[in-house]
Amino acid sequence: MAEFEKRLACVIAPDGSIARGYMIESCELVSANEYVITWKVPLQKEAKTNFSCVIGSVAYEDVEPGVCTVGLLADPLKMRVRTYDMTGKPAKRPFHLAAFRD
C-alpha cells in the first residue's frame, strides 16, 4: 500500500503556470482571477484537507499585495483558488498554496 501523502504544495504564477510544487498535476487560469488546480491525490473522501494560501512572489520579483480564497470542487482531485487586490477587485496574483491532509 502506498504511503498516505500528508502535504501538498505549489507556487503558481499570475498566468497560471506552475513555478514549483509537490504532488500538483496541473493549474489552469480559467478567468481573470480564478485558478483550477488538479492534484495527483484526492483532497476529499479518503482525506480531510486544510489549506493555507498567501499572495507571494514566484522568485525575486516584487508583488502587489492581495488576498486569495480557496475552495473544493466536485472532482476530488480539483480545487479552486481566486485572487484579489486589496480593494477586493479580481486580480491575477502569484500565490503559494499548502494543503495538509489527514
Regions found by a protein language model. Give the residues of each.
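Extracellular attachment/recognition segments
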Residues: 1-102
